[in-house]
Amino acid sequence: MKVETFSIGFGKPIVSWKWGEVKWQICFFLVGGYVKIAGMEREGDTKPQDIPQGFYSKTPWARIQVALAGPMVNLFFALIAFTTIWLLGGREKPFSHFTRLIGAMDPQSELYVNGVRPGDEITSYNKERFEGYKDLVYAAIINGRPTNIEGNKINYFKETKVPYDYLLTPYDSPLIKQGLKTIGILTPASYLIYGKQSGNQKGSIFRHSPISSSGIEPGDRLIWMDGELVFSVEQLTQILNSGKALLTIQRDKKTFLAKVPRLPIDDLQLTEEESTEIGDWQYEVGLQTKKTEIDFIPYMISTNLIVEKGVFFVDKDARMTHVASIPPTSQLDIPLQTGDRIIAVEGLPVSSARDFLKALQTKQTQMIVKRQGKINPILWEQEDIAFENETNWADLLPLTASIGLSNPLRQNGDFYLLNPVIPTRLKDFPFPQDMKDEMEGRVKKEMARVNKIANISVREAQIEEIKRYRNQLMLGAEFQDRPVIYNPNPFVLYGDVFREITRNLTALISGYFSPKYLGGPLFMVQVMKESWGIGIKEALFWIGAISLNLGVLNLLPIPVLDGGHICLSLIEKIRKKPLERKVINWLTIPFVILLIFAFIYLTYQDLARLLERFF
């Protein structure tokens, strides 16, 4: 066959030259390539079979061999790229990419109700070995049907594991983009290592952040906050915005921490006498806010901080609820009992009801960090074992037990209790003015979109969501994950990427996965640019992954693709006579149009994603 053009890459040629009768060119998208053979495109009224040395002038078997050559080069090139990565020692990736530990959960999910919490372990889903959070996303997307999930509930202090096994139905995720589903697990676990860019460096947006006065140092790992072990930034945000106060309680001769709802006083069902008494406390401590803006807890207490009774209150769904019926969302959600004595509010000792009322008006966060040397990368296969075993969790207990006492313990082993932090609402955070203007512009744009929604209930719900977003509390810290070395043998990596391709295709064909989440040509350019910025091994991975994608897609039985040419050649071999040119055109033209539309659609989605970053 006569080769007319040999192209390295796709798109517009960057450079081209003639060598003999063949045009050689290097194109803009340096992934894969193609060979243009005489006769593959129509030349006047000449039959394709009559073009000398043309593609259709050869036997079906010869054409199949030629059609296979391109995809096979792509597939082989991917293997070469993955082998090179393996020989270079693998890629450095975040701990969260491969961990089997849970980072954050939806408190309304069935899995959460069954007692699974952040920090617990997943071992399998649908009876298949669990390799990482991506497996759960695919399981929910592709199946959309009940998912079997197995794992272990971990008690880090007692070093025990209790197995669990549940069958759960995926539902729309409250955290991920609309159209994607979850079974209640929102993010994988990660390390929360306070980075240098979060410190008091000149020009840092975090320079005057709330956490800057806590005594935290670069390299510190946040372990515990307000009564809970912290396994992800998302969980940290949930704890920070839970609307609960951390109280130190004395019951009989024992002292313990408990989390109690902090509510607007107007939401509490109080008698006139009880309301008047709280008003007197407000006057005595000189709180200038309106009484309706005061926060309190759903308990009545005496002047010397003895719990007298629980009270009813209006919950977020406008239902009258008693404090005793609140479902627990934390191990510290312990209902207070008559006779309990409150001795501290969020670490601040109090001795009277008026002191308690004053302290309750200001949210303070208690945090414990693990102070250690540089954390070196480890192999991904050992990361969860290291997460569990490299920390002496029991050393936390003396620190947590002293919170709220007159002389709290500040250090025990590698653990340090930080100074209390008063978090700031997002809308009040001291961002640079240009960032503030950008954020306000986004909010106004989103409000304009929401105000056009015809459905009143949907519109009001989204307006409330925007308000919650602007009022969410934040520490003003940027945390880094622990790096791990991911270096499976090249055939395993090849198989992983191939399996991901087939899962995506299956989800697209079945309708469970929207094509708007796919990447187009601009996405590939963006990925390649970012990967080269990370390093040559990351760039090699994406070159190999894209090449493997192109090889697999090219083998699909679609006319105009190599897989389509193979199918047409097989049909000709079975029929023992060539197909008419008009039949080939009839089969090919619709798919050419479809591919053009797909290219335009994916490019549009790429542009939309890019513009989201700026507007």
Feature map (PLM): residue ranges:
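Short, flexible surface segments
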Residues: 20, 31, 118-121, 218, ...
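Internal alpha-helical transmembrane segments
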Residues: 25, 33-104, 155, 159, ...
